A protein has these predicted regions:
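Active-site loop-to-helix "anion-binding N-cap" substructures in soluble metabolic enzymes
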Residues: 1-250
Length: 250
């Protein structure tokens, strides 16, 4: 299958120095690298990950400030992330939207800061359980995309990834079927095709794990995964990555 996969680990607020050393000791001796592997640790560990990870692994941040500098306690600017050789940044994750009340307008500002800093954005979008049950999935996603991505942004080669994360399938034990996920990815793909001629990979962020990765990644419009809990186990994360390798090279 001639499709490049992007397998991204979102460690959220987890990890330690010993965890990082053990994690990459395991990956270094076991991983292939024809697809993109991205590790997004807490900011405090970005430098440690960069120093410890095999060279083929890309580093990503979990957030970026919408400001360049100033009295914004706890924030980290795009310039600071770039100084740490960060290559990707997660923007608009459902937990940021929920716990930090980030709006689509906030998310667009953050995406622009990532672009200014030459950091590839991973833009997260997705619907809640209530929105899915009331058949609003496509309306919600349409609004999230159009509120953030305009023609000027889409005219630039910014290395954008879209991560579809159905909120109802994150940390709940619920998972979208591969067909359900692919249908939404197809909608996003069709929508983006009308907005830009560039090909934008769309990855799945709804509790991908080793047991469902093959079925999901074999779907035509799923180009990888943004993986939370399962990425904290180096063996499971590597197995997911290797599934992507087998699909691409098999």
């Amino acid at each position: 299958m001639d499709k490049k996969f992007y397998i991204a680990a979102n460690w959220k607020m987890n990890a330690s120095l010993s965890f990082i050393n053990d994690y990459f000791s395991f990956l270094d001796s076991n991983a292939e690298n024809s697809n993109e592997m991205i590790i997004c640790p807490p900011d405090i560990y970005l430098e440690s990950v960069k120093k410890t990870a095999p060279n083929f692994i890309k580093t990503g941040a979990q957030n970026i400030s919408s400001n360049n500098t100033g009295a914004y306690t706890g924030e980290c600017s795009g310039e600071m992330l770039a100084d740490n050789s960060v290559q990707y940044v997660i923007i608009g994750h459902s937990e940021r939207r929920q716990y930090h009340q980030e709006s689509n307008e906030d998310i667009k500002l953050k995406l622009l800061k990532a672009i200014d800093s030459d950091i590839n954005p991973i833009l997260c979008i997705g619907e809640s359980k209530e929105e899915r049950e009331s058949d609003q999935t496509f309306d919600v996603i349409d609004k999230q995309i159009r509120s953030v991505l305009d023609s000027d942004i889409l005219s630039k080669d910014i290395g954008l990834l879209i991560a579809y994360e159905p909120i109802w399938a994150i940390g709940t034990g619920l998972t979208a079927t591969p067909e359900m996920a692919n249908d939404v990815h197809l909608f996003i793909h069709s929508m983006l095709s009308e907005m830009t001629s560039m090909s934008i990979p769309i990855i799945y962020g709804g509790s991908m794990k080793e047991s469902n990765a093959k079925e999901l990644l074999e779907m035509e419009h799923i180009h990888g995964g943004l993986i939370g809990c399962a990425s904290l186990d180096a063996s499971e994360f590597l197995n997911i990555y290797n599934i992507a390798e087998e699909i691409r090279n098999g």
